[in-house]
């Protein structure tokens, strides 16, 4: 009887361990990097460095393809008559201990932008969370209003979970992210002009 109970306990323990491993693996798979892209950044006309970002294309393929193509500029001219390209656009909203926002290549002030699918596209899913600094997420004006604007977190921003689609993470260049963050203030208006002077895709 005692040996049967012991065997049952060991079986339950093994099952629990396997379940925990599987859950961890599933969580890691959500963050599997399928593409790498970069921004070369200038602050007030001076080179600040490169931000390299890994994109989670298996979890949010449509959102990732939008961002990737806007980094390369391969889609040409959009409906607004502007190049569908982050190159030359700025970080127009920077709030220390929160995030840096960019991607408005049509207006430059947070009122514009355009996706490769047309002006806006729907929220793909909210499987990924804003669990720390360096996460890449879609800026929006409410539900299903994704365009080209994005933000990079500089802290955990869990209150944005379920409201903004996370699709990538900075893999190198957080020092550059923090340099950009230092140009912000609580109003969000940058102290200096922060420009993405080049952007593109890198091999994995």
UniProtKB/Swiss-Prot annotation:
GO terms for cellular component: chloroplast; endoplasmic reticulum; extracellular region; plasmodesma; plastid. InterPro entries: Cyclophilin-like_dom_sf (IPR029000), Cyclophilin-type_PPIase (IPR024936), Cyclophilin-type_PPIase_CS (IPR020892), Cyclophilin-type_PPIase_dom (IPR002130). Gene3D superfamilies: Cyclophilin-like (2.40.100.10). Ubiquitous, mostly in aerial organs. Higher levels in leaf and buds, and lower levels in seedlings. Binds cyclosporin A (CsA). CsA mediates some of its effects via an inhibitory action on PPIase. It is an enzyme of class 5 (isomerase). It catalyses: [protein]-peptidylproline (omega=180) = [protein]-peptidylproline (omega=0). Its EC number is 5.2.1.8. Belongs to the cyclophilin-type PPIase family. Interacts with the PP2A A subunit PP2AA1/RCN1. This is Peptidyl-prolyl cis-trans isomerase CYP20-1. It comes from Arabidopsis thaliana (Mouse-ear cress). The gene is CYP20-1.
